[in-house]
UniProtKB/Swiss-Prot annotation:
Post-translational events: Substrate for phosphorylation by PKA and PKC. Reversible phosphorylation appears to modulate contraction.
Gene Ontology CC, one term: cytoskeleton
Record's protein name: Myosin-binding protein C, cardiac-type
Modified residues (Omega-N-methylarginine): 1237
Taxonomic source organism: Mus musculus
UniProt-listed GO biological process terms: cardiac muscle contraction; cell adhesion; heart morphogenesis; muscle contraction; myosin filament assembly; regulation of heart contraction; regulation of heart rate; sarcomere organization
Binding annotation for Zn(2+): 206, 208, 221, 223
SUPFAM superfamilies: Fibronectin type III, Immunoglobulin
Length: 1270
């Protein structure tokens, strides 16, 4: 069952709707399922419908159709369609055809039956019953304008076609159901195919949206005002959510505005829509057709509705702007045609507005917050009412308590919302609502950069092979971009590239690589990128071992074997050019890269040319099979032994065998009686000696001498090396030939009649040994030179060439750099990535095959020199020096910068002289010791580990000669007036100047040279500084600075005023006293603090309290009258002086108090008997017994009185609680409170409150019971 409160998922994407048709027409109902291949049943009144003459059933992919032919009133009723567990019901209503009206009889065939109404009228019209559609007589249904409750897609109501006259306004509306959406839908409006209307919002086009919280329906509107003919055309509305998408197309027709004198009656009667074309308006008579009264009526309606023909109501735009919020000013101004709105809006902003102060919030939220993804954020407000309730909203919807994601805190007047584990879904607008007030903020969730933890690997493939690039990033679900040669690979190229995600792993797959796919591929994330190279080579088949000629005897086995580079390549065996068909005697095998042809029981018919042709390659491997026929001739008995070979004699051909292959020497022999066969192998070579001629050997001039060898007898009949002898032949076999088996073998046959001997030379060849590790040199930006030595042993065959491989140091994949063998012992490798460490290795190749790889070279990193520095300029020139400055090169590269070199040369000379030994890291330099008057060119080069980069040279020669410049002081504006500083403050006066050569600077004060350690002067080539660490009054005065070059000079005067607090006024005295008034007089202070006295402060103090109160402040005169004194009190008076620094530290005060007497009356205070208010403690409200629940704070209260204030003590079961931090005791206005924090059952017992003072003691007690919650 579906979960409660959730809508079950329907199996239909498109549901059939109820229809109303006329009798005799056909009704068509369509349904679309979520996936194809679903069994769908159609029912009427609970019974299944089958295909017959009445009902037509059709299914095409996801689309299923029911057609009711020749509908009659009997076909009315309830129908249903069922797919799986989903069932949708709909109704069919059949009506009698209406009689044709007279007006319609005059309309030509093909005229439209109804005139579409404008979109504004469609919205105001009353919709017909839910789900109904009107069906024409040809069976085509038109959707009703009303919105069905069960939407198709995401729309509740789709925007409809509309018409408007030029200058009019129209509104297109779309409603989207939001009950099942987790986030607000995103709606985009388009005109034509690609024009996004959000970029065209302005005076004539506006987009509005709203949300009805009660019905949970989103309303999106497109407002077009002052429509023009260019506004006509097709529009599209697209709505999308997280996992759903829907769109709707609609049209807007704009008619020309028709005045009362412009209406052409004849053209109005002409039909303006052509068959098979869109609507168009034409005033020419050539395009006119038959009269069309509906068109005339339509133009009449549009003429009446034309907004330009009606007098618009007067609107006070100024009043609307005054009542609107500032964010709506620009929209209202554009809407009412006010284009130059800057001055009115400026005036409106300048008007005084009564800003309403927030009464609910004391501290609001900040305008915006930012938090990293996965972190926690706290949003805090402070309320005016601590007991007020708050609501937190996210994008307008209230946040509910859900686990540990949202935490609501309330501490006093503070309200806090804590969001844990922030994700991108938390990036939203938040509001805190208190009553009718609210404050808003924006939360921005910042994603940490996605790093690449495993980089891409270089790959080398053949054409047609599968390529897969793989990388690993730091986060799952991260978005990555794949690029080829800097161009992003988009999803539109999925027919060639396939993108795959597996957790943190990302794959780029090319199913069949072509030559065009070669290049540099990169994967880019928000935190970096990784680059790899793909090299695609055309398929080229290499033959590691070719087939060889064979010579075998009858009934023997012949084996042809070859080895190629590609184990997937198949081939065909040919015999004399014809394909060889395998049978029981002839077998063909293919294991890995080895192809083998085996012929058992060889016969003379098998002697032929055999070839192996690989499929798909224009090459073949050929060999010949020789059949050795043994001829038996009749010989008399006592025949001497004879060895029958193809090359008899003392120098037979050398027999070559590959290491690991089987060596079989089949030697036919004859003799009677049967001879004895002896096989021997030469072990060591002896001395040279003369030898007699062999009896059967041909005469040869050079055959009179031969070498004498020490020989090893071979007589084993089993094992790896064995000898098998029969009557007519002797077979010498070596299983798995090795290097030690190489040498000269001697076959000797003997019988009583004589003997015969033959030497056979066997040579064992192998693949070469691995070369030594290659050496790397001439490392450049993307290239290097690789050098190596030949292998120590070439395998018995000359080395044909070498194969070079490289890999990234942190990778495990080696990539081949050449397919054609390298003949030289060096190679320049290119197309490497700068800044990536590489290793190289080399293979040696001979006729047998490829050697093992050499050890890897030392790691190296291709690094190119940096670019040339920029903006080289001459900063200063003197008689022997030139000051240069420049900026870093635009391209630094992976090698960084080690420094810069500076060189110079004479004009017209090509020899450059270094200006300094080594490099400098600074970007400026002073070149010294240059010849005066010389014209020199300067150049600067940047260096790194790869060497120097390109130089930058001064554009013109520089003449080494001092340029005389008149001295001039550039006195800052703030130093041209009196400089005021307080005592103790530092003084730092910087005065820039100009002049060449360097001017001489002189400071004087009052015409005297400056002296003393407190004032210091610091000079540089461009400015001078006067510095005083702590200013004193004696530093005040007039300073003069002079810069001089020979007989030229410039002066400037500075006035420094050091100010301090003034001294107190002098000679304060009381001039007169009368009534409630006192007249005071004093003299100005002796020291005014080196600045003007701003005023005085007069204070009075009552003799009884001696608390001073200010009477006059900032008073500028030296006499005053203090009024409103109290009769009978005595007063003291004092006066402070003030200047710009502050008030004087001391005041001038009157020595004797001034008494204000009551005239004529002497007051005698009454005598009273002193009362004793002391009282012993007593409890006015004793403690009461309580029963509380454990874990919740508890309070015990009582009230006590007594004088003097009694001392309070609390006890529990006789123990004093004053030292226990779990108990808090309060006393306010005689009310005593004991707070027990989170009590436990152990806190139960008898509590006593005791009050004690000098008059006595009192106490009260109660019993506290702590219950454990059930």
């Amino acid at each position: 069952m579906p979960e409660p409160g959730k809508k079950p998922v329907s199996a239909f994407n498109k549901k059939p709707r109820s229809a109303e048709v006329t009798a005799g027409s056909a009704a068509v109902f369509e349904a679309e399922t979520e996936r194809s291949g679903v069994m769908v049943r159609w029912q009427r009144d609970g019974s299944d419908i089958t295909a017959n003459d009445k009902y037509g059933l059709a299914a095409e992919g996801k689309r299923h159709t029911l057609t009711v032919r020749d509908a009659s009133p009997d076909d009315q009723g309830s129908y249903a369609v069922i797919a799986g567990s989903s069932k949708v019901k709909f109704d069919l209503k059949v009506t009698e055809p209406a009689p044709p009206e007279k007006a319609e009889s005059e309309v030509a065939p093909g005229a439209p039956e109804e005139v579409p109404a404008p979109a504004t009228e469609l919205e105001e019209s009353v919709s017909s019953p839910e789900g109904s559609v009107s069906v024409t007589q040809d069976g085509s249904a038109a959707e009703h304008q009303g919105a069905p409750d069960d939407p198709i897609g995401l729309f509740l109501m789709r925007p409809q076609d509309g018409e408007v006259t030029v200058g009019g306004s129209i509104v297109f509306s779309a409603r989207v159901a939001g009950a099942s959406l987790l986030k607000p839908p995103v709606v985009k409006w388009f005109k034509g195919k690609w024009v996004d209307l959000s970029s065209k919002v302005g005076q004539h086009l506006q987009l509005h949206d709203s949300y009805d919280r009660a019905s949970k329906v989103y309303l999106f509107e497109l407002h077009i005002t002052d429509a023009q003919t260019t506004s006509a055309g097709g529009y599209r509305c697209e709505v999308s959510t997280k996992d759903k998408f829907d769109s709707c197309n609609f049209n807007l027709t704009v008619h020309e505005a028709i005045g009362s004198g412009d209406l052409d009656l004849r053209s109005a009667f002409r039909r303006t829509s052509l068959a098979g074309a869109g609507r168009r308006t034409s005033d020419s008579h050539e395009d006119a057709g038959t009269p069309d009264f509906s068109s005339l009526l339509k133009k009449r309606d549009s003429f009446r509705r034309d907004s330009k023909l009606e007098a618009p109501a007067e609107e006070d735009v100024w009043e609307i702007l005054r009542q609107a919020p500032p964010s709506e000013y620009e929209r209202i101004a554009f809407q009412h045609g006010v284009e130059a709105c800057h001055r009115p809006l400026k005036r409106l902003k300048g008007m005084k507005q009564d800003e309403k102060k927030s009464t609910a919030f004391q501290k609001k939220l900040e305008p915006a917050y930012q938090v990293n993804k996965g972190h926690k954020i706290r949003l805090t407000v402070e309320l005016a009412d601590p007991d007020a309730e708050v609501k937190w909203l996210k994008n307008g919807q209230e946040i509910q308590m859900s686990g540990s994601k949202y935490i609501f805190e309330s501490v006093g007047a503070k309200r806090t919302l804590t969001i844990s584990q922030c994700s991108l879904a938390d990036d939203a607008a938040y509001q805190c609502v208190v009553g009718g007030e609210k404050c808003s903020t924006e939360l921005f969730v910042k994603e940490p950069p996605v790093l690449i933890t495993r980089s891409l690997e270089d790959q080398l493939v053949m054409v047609g092979q599968r390529v897969e690039f793989e990388c690993e990033v730091s986060e799952e679900g991260a978005q990555v971009k794949w690029l080829k040669d800097g161009v992003e690979l988009t999803r539109e190229e999925t027919f060639k590239y396939r993108f795959k995600k597996d957790g943190r792993k990302h794959h780029l797959i090319i199913n069949e690589a072509t030559l065009e796919d070669a290049g540099h591929y990169a994967v880019r994330t928000s935190g970096g990128q990784s680059l790899a190279e793909l090299i695609v080579q055309e398929k080229k088949l290499e033959v590691y071992q070719s087939i060889a000629d064979l010579a075998v005897g009858a009934k023997d086995q012949a084996v042809f074997k070859c080895e190629v580079s590609d184990e997937n390549v198949r081939g065909v065996w040919l015999k004399n050019g014809k394909e060889l068909v395998p049978d029981n005697r002839i077998k063909v095998s293919h294991i890995g890269r080895v192809h083998k042809l085996t012929i058992d029981d060889v016969t003379p018919a098998d002697e032929a040319d055999y070839s192996f042709v690989p499929e798909g390659f224009a090459c073949n491997l050929s060999a010949k099979l020789h059949f050795m026929e043994v001829k038996i001739d009749f010989v008399p008995r006592q025949e001497p032994p004879k060895i029958h070979l193809d090359c008899p004699g003392s120098t037979p051909d050398t027999i070559v065998v590959v290491t690991g292959n089987k060596l079989r020497l089949d030697v036919p022999i004859s003799g009677d009686p049967a001879p004895t066969v002896v096989w021997q192998k030469t072990v060591t070579q002896g001395k040279k000696a003369s030898a007699g001629p062999h009896p059967d050997a041909p005469e040869d001039a050079g055959a009179d001498e031969e070498w004498v060898f020490d020989k090893k007898l071979l007589c084993e009949t089993e094992g790896r090396v064995r000898v098998e002898t029969t009557k007519d032949r002797s077979v010498f076999t070596v299983e798995g030939a090795e290097k030690e088996d190489e040498g000269v073998y001697t076959v000797t046959v003997k019988n009583p009649v004589g003997e015969d001997q033959v030497n056979l030379t066997v040579k064992v060849i192998d693949v070469p040994d691995a070369p030594a590790a290659p050496k790397i040199s001439n490392v450049g930006e993307d290239s290097c030179t690789v050098q190596w030595e030949p292998p120590a042993y070439d395998g018995g065959q000359p080395v044909l060439g070498y194969i070079l491989e490289r890999k990234k140091k942190k990778s495990y994949r080696w990539m081949r750099l050449n397919f054609d063998l390298l003949r030289e012992l060096s190679h320049e490798a290119r197309r490497m990535i700068e800044g990536v460490a590489y290793e190289m290795r080399v293979y040696a190749v001979n006729a047998v095959g490829m050697s093992r790889p050499s050890p890897a070279s030392q790691p190296f990193m291709p690094i190119g020199p940096p670019g040339e520095p920029t903006h080289l300029a001459v900063e200063d020139v003197s008689d022997t020096t030139v000051s240069l400055k420049w900026r870093p090169p635009e391209r630094v590269g992976a090698g960084g910068l080690d420094g810069y070199s500076v060189e110079y040369c004479q004009e017209g000379c090509s020899e450059w002289t270094p200006a300094l030994q080594g490099l400098t890291e600074r970007r400026s330099m002073l070149v010294k010791d240059l010849p005066t008057g010389a014209r020199l060119l300067f150049r600067v080069r940047a260096h790194n580990v790869a060497g120097p980069g390109g130089p930058i040279v001064t554009k013109e020669p520089v003449t080494v000669q001092e340029i005389l410049q008149r001295p001039r002081l550039q006195l800052p504006r703030h130093l041209r007036q009196t400089i005021q500083k307080k005592v103790g403050e530092p003084v730092n006066l910087l005065i820039p100047f100009q002049g060449k050569p360097r001017p001489q600077v002189t400071w004087t004060k009052e015409g005297q040279p400056l002296a003393g350690e407190e004032v210091s002067i610091r000079n540089s080539p461009t400015d001078t500084i006067l510095f005083i660490r702590a200013a004193r009054r004696t530093h005040s005065g007039t300073y003069q600075v002079t810069v001089r070059i020979e007989n030229m000079e410039d002066k400037a005067t500075l006035i420094l005023q050091i100010v301090d607090k003034p001294s107190p006024p002098q000679d304060i005295r009381i001039v007169e006293t009368w009534g409630f008034n006192v007249a005071l007089e004093w003299k100005p202070p002796q020291d005014d603090g080196n600045t003007e006295i701003w005023g005085y402060t007069v204070q009075k103090a009552d003799k009884k309290t001696m608390e001073w109160f200010t009477v006059l402040e900032h008073y500028r005169r030296t006499h005053c009258v203090v009024s409103e004194l109290i009769i009978g009190n005595g007063y003291y008076f004092r006066v402070f002086s003030h200047n710009m620094v502050g008030s004087s530290d001391k005041a001038a005060a009157t020595k004797e108090p001034v008494f204000i007497p009551r005239p004529g009356i002497t007051y005698e205070p009454p005598k009273y008997k002193a009362l004793d208010f002391s009282e012993a403690p007593s409890f006015t409200q004793p403690l009461a017994n309580r029963s509380i629940i454990a874990g919740y704070n508890a309070i015990l209260c009582c009230a006590v009185r007594g004088s003097p204030k009694p001392k309070i003590s609390w006890f529990k079961n006789g123990l004093d609680l004053g030292e226990d931090a779990r108990f808090r005791m309060f006393c306010k206005q005689g009310v005593l409170t004991l707070e027990i924090r989170k009590p436990c059952p152990y806190d139960g017992g008898v509590y006593v409150c005791r009050a004690t003072n000098l008059q006595g003691e009192a106490q009260c007690e109660c019993r506290l019971e702590v219950r454990v919650p059930q």
